[in-house]
């Protein structure tokens, strides 16, 4: 299941409550073609990796989070463990997304 983040406090709450679990963040926008293309795959990964927390942040709705996380383009995927960023890449690369999750588990 993918959780939609609506506020900076909700974002921080997910990072804090994840504990030792990996958190994968999809920074996207409704107008972004590649974001729409990879979204079903991101949701499928959330079913496959049920020990990983998957969240989506709309950069237009949550500009403060996008700015704080230094998101420059969409989609950007960031990976957090124990509240710390442990990985990041940009672009709708399905293979890289799944490989990065496997690597960080």
UniProtKB/Swiss-Prot annotation:
Give the modified residues of type N6-acetyllysine. Answer: 3, 39, 94
Primary location = nucleus
UniProt site (Contributes to redox potential value): 33-34
- PROSITE patterns registered for this protein in UniProt: THIOREDOXIN_1, THIOREDOXIN_2
| Post-translational modifications | In the fully reduced protein, both Cys-69 and Cys-73 are nitrosylated in response to nitric oxide (NO). When two disulfide bonds are present in the protein, only Cys-73 is nitrosylated. Cys-73 can serve as donor for nitrosylation of target proteins.
Q: Where is this site: Deprotonates C-terminal active site Cys?
A: 26
Q: Which GO terms describe its molecular function?
A: protein-disulfide reductase activity
Share what the entry says about its subunit structure, partners included. Homodimer; disulfide-linked. Interacts with TXNIP through the redox-active site. Interacts with MAP3K5 and CASP3. Interacts with APEX1; the interaction stimulates the FOS/JUN AP-1 DNA-binding activity in a redox-dependent manner.
What role does it play?
Answer: Participates in various redox reactions through the reversible oxidation of its active center dithiol to a disulfide and catalyzes dithiol-disulfide exchange reactions. Plays a role in the reversible S-nitrosylation of cysteine residues in target proteins, and thereby contributes to the response to intracellular nitric oxide. Nitrosylates the active site Cys of CASP3 in response to nitric oxide (NO), and thereby inhibits caspase-3 activity.
Protein's name according to its UniProt entry: Thioredoxin
């Amino acid at each position: 299941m993918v959780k939609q983040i609506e506020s900076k406090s909700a974002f921080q709450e997910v990072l804090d409550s994840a504990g030792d679990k990996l958190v994968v963040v999809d920074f996207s926008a409704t107008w972004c073609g590649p974001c729409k293309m990879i979204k079903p795959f991101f949701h499928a990964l959330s079913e496959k990796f049920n020990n990983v927390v998957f969240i989506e942040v709309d950069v237009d709705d949550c500009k403060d989070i996008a700015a704080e996380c230094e998101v420059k383009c969409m989609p950007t995927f960031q990976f957090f463990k124990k509240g710390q960023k442990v990985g990041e890449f940009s672009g709708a690369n399905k293979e890289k997304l799944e490989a990065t999750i496997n690597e960080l588990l």
